[in-house]
Amino acid sequence: MALWAKARVRMAGPWLSLHEARLLGTRGAAAPKAVLPFEAMPRCPGNKWMRMLQIWKEQSSENMHLDMHQTFQELGPIFRYDVGGRHMVFVMLPEDVERLQQADSHHPQRMILEPWLAYRQARGHKCGVFLLNGPQWRLDRLRLNPDVLSLPALQKYTPLVDGVARDFSQTLKARVLQNARGSLTLDIAPSVFRYTIEASTLVLYGERLGLLTQQPNPDSLNFIHALEAMLKSTVQLMFVPRRLSRWMSTNMWREHFEAWDYIFQYANRAIQRIYQELALGHPWHYSGIVAELLMRADMTLDTIKANTIDLTAGSVDTTAFPLLMTLFELARNPEVQQAVRQESLVAEARISENPQRAITELPLLRAALKETLRLYPVGITLEREVSSDLVLQNYHIPAGTLVKVLLYSLGRNPAVFARPESYHPQRWLDRQGSGSRFPHLAFGFGVRQCLGRRVAEVEMLLLLHHVLKNFLVETLEQEDIKMVYRFILMPSTLPLFTFRAIQ
């Protein structure tokens, strides 16, 4: 415990001045008696149609998180942001998140990702919960939760993830020990991406792709390329209404559809294989989420496929980038890294005997992941289309308004997190039982929180556990990494890492 408390931390980006900290406290200014009309809310400057045109021209909005963060500092903790014909409200205080959650209906509404929806409509595929709103969303979500998000489900698939994480560590160790110095400097990002795909497909479909081997099979590589192409084209299509982009970006739409075609073909083959195996007799061992859903038999095959594909598509970048940023922060904060490593070494025997114990035996490592996601939230906003009139920061919010919580600004608000520029995992352990009820929001809140949350958490936790107990992780890069928004928040570049084997 003493080692944790005295671990030195390095700065992690710009922070608000004292004046700005007072402006953006955990609570807004004392509200006047009369609620102010929606039209009186501070508005992000600029022409809403020119803003949309600029986004389309650039086919991205890479600095959106920084632009919105700056706007909060200029306008206060709430403002309107209009793009084209859509009115949005941005907030960044925990109290407003709490009010949004209290106002949640039985089926909270959120924006639908147009490129993904367009593909499914054109091909006649069903939509999974990621692309649904309303009663159908709730029905499917309640049927998925027991086999994906529940603690009993987590206990079942944790050993599968542990096997992949151990293989990753052993493969890396073999490469490191080929060097006489017992160390290796490399770009670890491709290997981490392969790990997340390997682990996720095993949890979902119960099969290994062989991506951690020296020569992965061509089908597995084609699957990776399809996922990469789908995500890249999503970024370039998501910012402009479909009615405009369909004739302005025809090549990109073709690439998007071809990538999805391959992903659906892969999922079809995998699900049919599982279905045929079950038809011959129930497996005597746990063999993944899809098998559990098929055996439960309360969803159609098309619905299972739709939701499995959503989980597949959403399980790669969103897990890989937090892993890489955690390695980066631990590499440039060696005393924090040593404290986390010591925790893993102490718990290793118990986790080796029962991998499920990693969830309870590694509190500091879990706190490090929370700290990474505080500073670098993969999804920079949480959103709700409010179903009834609401008051936020004493402004009237009409029903049907899209409200976005900017996690990037919430996580860097000094009135919410002391010294927010510091990478300090211990803060999450000190805060237990006190402070805001909603400090960790990277996976959303309420009934619409991320369905794949527990899969992602255990994949990150076990990989870091096995890597840190076997290697010292170092980097020469000590400056902050520039983060860009491309559908998710990601590093524009990543430094090389040196892995030194621990004898």
Swiss-Prot record:
Pathway the protein acts in: Steroid biosynthesis; glucocorticoid biosynthesis; Steroid hormone biosynthesis
UniProt-recorded Gene Ontology molecular function terms: corticosterone 18-monooxygenase activity; heme binding; iron ion binding; steroid 11-beta-monooxygenase activity
PROSITE patterns named among the record's database cross-references: CYTOCHROME_P450
A Gene Ontology cellular-component term: mitochondrial inner membrane
Pfam families, A to Z: p450
UniProt keyword list: Heme, Iron, Lipid metabolism, Membrane, Metal-binding, Mitochondrion, Mitochondrion inner membrane, Monooxygenase, Oxidoreductase, Steroid metabolism, Steroidogenesis, Transit peptide
InterPro entries linked: CYP11_CYP27_families, Cyt_P450, Cyt_P450_CS, Cyt_P450_E_grp-I, Cyt_P450_sf
Name the record gives this protein: Cytochrome P450 11B1, mitochondrial
Gene: CYP11B1
